[in-house]
Curated annotation (Swiss-Prot):
It catalyses: Ca(2+)(in) = Ca(2+)(out); Na(+)(in) = Na(+)(out); K(+)(in) = K(+)(out); NH4(+)(in) = NH4(+)(out). PANTHER family: CYCLIC NUCLEOTIDE-GATED CATION CHANNEL ALPHA-4, CYCLIC NUCLEOTIDE-GATED CATION CHANNEL SUBUNIT A. The gene is CNGA4. Residues 61-70, 136-140, 191-213 are extracellular. Belongs to the cyclic nucleotide-gated cation channel (TC 1.A.1.5) family. CNGA4 subfamily. GO terms for cellular component: ciliary membrane; Golgi-associated vesicle membrane; intracellular cyclic nucleotide activated cation channel complex; non-motile cilium membrane; plasma membrane. Ca(2+)-calmodulin exerts its inhibitory effect in cAMP sensitivity by binding to IQ-like motif of CNGA4 and preferably binds to the channel in the closed state. Inhibition by PIP3 of the CNG channel probably occurs via CGNA2 binding. Residues 1-38, 92-116, 160-166, 274-575 are cytoplasmic. Residues 544-556 have a biased composition (Acidic residues). The lineage of its organism: Eukaryota, Metazoa, Chordata, Craniata, Vertebrata. It is a multi-pass membrane protein. Residues 354-474 are annotated as: Cyclic nucleotide-binding domain. Changing L292E: Loss of inhibition produced by calcium/calmodulin binding. The keyword Transmembrane applies. This is Cyclic nucleotide-gated channel alpha-4.
């Protein structure tokens, strides 16, 4: 009995996770670990693409460092093998959800071309060393099949880097170097096949002083290949068929390479210009407009300086257009991370709901003011409030010179004018002149945007009005009597509105009752009309009466029976 109980307990307990499952978790293809592993795979792939072909074409390089090459070869093979293990533990997206089932991941991977290429790149071709010797690195050319991992790593880096255009240029230069490197190796191998020093085109005889060194051999071949592929010329003419074929192939490669380089560089420059146009407004159109309208030189200079300040200091005025392609929630998170700290410093917005602040940051409009420019003047109607992000603003007198105070970064003004506070003695008018001392970056929040957001947060609106009232009390800008009068007027208006609503409800009820009575009367009238029509159809026509008189009276019993049946049937009722 105890044994059975023990067996059942063992079967019902869940299996313990294996160590392999803990050590090899499923990687997210868009995560950091997978990204850094791709960057690690760049080294063995680049090693094989650059060093392997060089060892195959330069025997001195292969023979001089054989032990080092064998160590590096099998280290790269180990990384190739680990890369396949990583591929078996890299999830994939299915309907937007990351699949972490290792069985499904493995079955999906083995059905792709990547699996066969990875497997072919690890074929143990080195076993032929037993027959041909270790100085035949061409047996390892199948390692080139892992090159797609290099391209994938470059694509991921281009997406993540903060300087994508610079990375594209660096990647293009790397491709150019690899092509010239391969071509120089093939040139040296062809020269050795044809015979060193046989003519002016091939590599000189290594027996000559200075040409026997490995460094000289590679640099000469690289220089010769650069001259050919850049179509600079100044190279000895070919003398044999093999040399002609090599030159023709290089010229065709140079034409395609030149077109590729020009296209890539044009694309990079165009993308840079497009990005600048998206971030900063186009000043050429404004300059042309000012010239056509004969704007005075001083004002034109101020406009040009404003545009120059934006571009030099990387200021942006159209953040909404830049982030318009992001989903709404993601755009809100970006705006919150950038502007929430600034908005939370405003006194009337403190202790407000986080969701309210997230809605407000989407409404902030960045503005840049140049030196001496007025942000607002006394007596202007206040339709927005301002938050100082960077720079200094002065509260000046009407003469524009006398300064009463200086506002710095993090301060704000105009917040009272966008909140309808009862008893506000200044109303929605500006009470001071605000002028920018230098270039100032501000955030603008309009009354309409605030009203739109607060319509969904009535409690927050009440809290903000209370805070604004406290601020006005401290500033002695609140008329308590006027506030009480406005409150009484509002209550009276609301009472009248409630009365009108009640009267409207009563009228609607009476109208519905009258409409029902009208429909009932119409139904009764229709029934009576239908009954009259039925009765008129039963009456005999005058011609029928005359014929009946000529033929004689009908039998008395029959006539009475028919009249009785007609009176009993009656007219048909309404359907």
């Amino acid at each position: 009995m105890s044994q059975d109980t023990k067996v059942k307990t063992t079967e019902s307990s869940p299996p313990a996770p294996s160590k392999a499952r803990k050590l090899l978790p499923v990687l997210d293809p868009s995560g950091d670990y997978y990204y850094w592993w791709l960057n690690t795979m760049v080294f063995p792939v680049m090693y094989n693409l650059i060093i392997l072909v060089c060892r195959a074409c330069f025997p001195d390089l292969q023979h001089g460092y054989l032990v080092a090459w064998l160590v590096l070869d099998y280290t790269s093979d180990l990384l190739y093998l680990l890369d396949m293990v990583v591929r078996f533990h890299t999830g994939f997206l299915e309907q937007g959800i990351l699949v972490v089932d290792k069985g499904r991941i493995s079955s999906r991977y083995v059905r792709t071309w990547s699996f066969f290429l990875d497997l072919a790149s690890l074929m143990p071709t080195d076993v032929v060393y037993v027959r041909l010797g270790p100085h035949t690195p061409t047996l390892r050319l199948n390692r080139f099949l892992r090159a797609p991992r290099l391209f994938e790593a470059f694509d991921r880096t281009e997406t993540r880097t903060a300087y994508p255009n610079a990375f594209r240029i660096a990647k293009l230069m790397l491709y150019i170097f690899v092509v010239i490197h391969w071509n120089s190796c093939l040139y040296f191998a062809l020269s050795r096949y044809l015979g060193f020093g046989r003519d002016a085109w091939v590599y000189p005889d290594p027996a000559q002083p200075g040409f026997e060194r490995l460094r000289r051999q590679y640099l000469y071949s690289f220089y010769f290949s650069t001259l050919i592929l850049t179509t600079v010329g100044d190279t000895p003419p070919p003398a044999r068929e093999e040399e002609y074929l090599f030159m023709v192939g290089d010229f065709l490669l140079a034409v395609m390479g030149f077109a590729t380089i020009m296209g890539s560089m044009s694309s990079v420059i165009y993308n840079m210009n497009t990005a600048d146009a998206a971030f900063y407004p186009d000043h050429a159109l404004v300059k042309k407009y000012m010239k056509l309208q004969h704007v005075n030189r001083k004002l034109e200079r101020r406009v040009i300086d404003w545009y120059q300040h934006l571009q030099i200091n990387k200021k942006m005025t159209n953040e909404v257009a830049i982030l318009q392609h992001l989903p709404e929630r993601l755009r809100a998170e970006v705006a919150v991370s950038v502007h929430l700290s600034t908005l939370s410093r405003v006194q009337i917005f403190q202790n407000c709901e986080a969701s309210l602040l997230e809605e407000l940051v989407l409404k902030l409009q960045p503005q840049t003011y140049s030196p001496g420019e007025y942000v607002c003047r006394k007596g202007d109607i206040g339709q927005e409030m301002y938050i100082i992000r960077e720079g200094q603003l002065a509260v000046v007198a009407d003469d524009g010179i006398t300064q009463y105070a200086v506002l710095g970064a993090g301060l704000y003004f105009g917040e009272i004018s966008i909140i309808n506070i009862k008893g506000n003695m200044s109303g929605n008018r500006r009470t001071a002149n605000i002028k920018s001392l230098g270039y100032s970056d501000l955030f603008c929040l309009s009354k309409e945007d605030l009203r739109e957001v607060l319509s969904e947060y009535p409690q927050a609106q009440t809290i903000m009005e209370e805070k604004g009232r406290e601020i006005l009390l401290k500033m002695n800008k609140l008329d308590v009597n006027a506030e009480a009068a406005e409150i009484a007027l509002q209550e009276a208006t609301e009472s009248r509105l409630r009365g009108l609503d009640q009267q409207l409800d009563d009228l609607q009820t009476k109208f519905a009752r009258l409409l029902a009575e009208l429909e009932s009367s119409a139904l009764k009238i229709a029934y009576r009309i239908e009954r009259l029509e039925w009765q008129t159809r039963e009456w005999p026509m005058p011609e029928d009466l005359a014929e009946a008189d000529d033929e004689g009276e009908p039998e008395e019993g029959t006539s009475k029976d028919e009249e009785g049946r007609a009176s009993q049937e009656g007219p048909p009722g309404p359907e």
